[in-house]
């Protein structure tokens, strides 16, 4: 699959979607309205510089993240739904009240049923909220798998095929 890939890594002292690490990972207790974090503001500038390149297909912009990165996936798709054709949050969490804004982004959500760091109930609620908003969304839960469900997610046979099939309408 030919593509331009941005693969940012958050610093040890930073946190993607929030100015600081949330004190609790319960979807209903996650913030619903907050300013963009400084680290995400810089990342958005970098993304915009790539989007300005004529060779980048603006109808095929995808975002994938795991754990804290999945929280970032939710945050950026809510803030900038016009950019993304598809999103894959893996073992993430979000306040479901935020997701209506991302209804035009196609989602494939992954989580392990035994995740004791970020509870799968957050992904289940995100799935239900996106479905209710009219989004095209799939939820795949891996039975018996803990927080490292990205191993199983990346090994789903049609992972890349599904992603690269998505196009912004």
Regions found by a protein language model. Name each.
Residues 1-40:
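Active-site machinery of serine-nucleophile hydrolases
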